[in-house]
Amino acid sequence: MAETAGTADTAAPPRAAADAAGRRGHLAADLRAVRVLWQREVIRFGRNRLRIAMSVIMPMMFLLVFGTGLNAAVPAEQDATSDFRAFFFPGVLLMAVQAPAMAAGASIVWDRQAGFLRQLLVAPVRRPPLLTGTCLGGATAGLGYALPVLCLAGLVGIPYRPELLLVLAELALIAFAFTSLGVLVAVCAKHPETFQIVIGLCMMPLLFLSGAVFPASGLPGWLGTVVSLNPLTYAVDALRRTLPGEGVSGLGDRAAGPQWGDWTPSVPAELGCVAVLAALALTVATYRFARSE
């Protein structure tokens, strides 16, 4: 009996060590899958130079043409800080991040059509890291599109200060949220045409109902409710309150952000809303991905 107990005691540590080694092996495989899929999205982003150029040109056209036109239509304040282009600049940053980040989900749809996704699914890797790597790659690509636009902030009177580094970090979080939404749509949509239609229907309403083009406060009735419920409203307002210079909020009281009664959310609270959106979208996408494929 004593001999048997001694044998069990000596067998337990090797079994525990084997379990720990197995967990480390699974973690290493998951991290490797995340890194490979992240690199894949980044390489795809770097090779498509025409798309990079067009994604930068379109937001700048909105800023210089649409923004300048509305700047002439908005009544000027008494000071010299009233510039609608500076107010519109956070929306332009959001526009630069939005399209490429949400389009990252298209890679999942095309991989499903080409059969590459099936090869990923039979690999000895859990499925959540597959979506996480794609989301991180899409967020990196979206940040790469927004960086040239951010460098042109001086064109609308926004000074180059260290606060722009905080804006860059906020854009990274916003890009990850957009990519998570795009991945969620891609997991639910089985065909490329369906994905493109859904993304096209979602992008513009999300942008225009986020306070990017007009102030989020003081809106009438149902419109104010819809804008307040849009998570991207808080992303735009966080960018607007972080960007340096008075010109960003130079429309006076009309440039106030979203409010819930007498409470105005702080910038960390607004970024928390964006983080919750990203986490929910990625969680639902992972659940659907595990059940549908």
Predicted regions and their residues:
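Short helix-coil transition/hinge motifs at the ends and kinks of transmembrane helices
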Residues: G22-R24, A73-S82, E246-P265
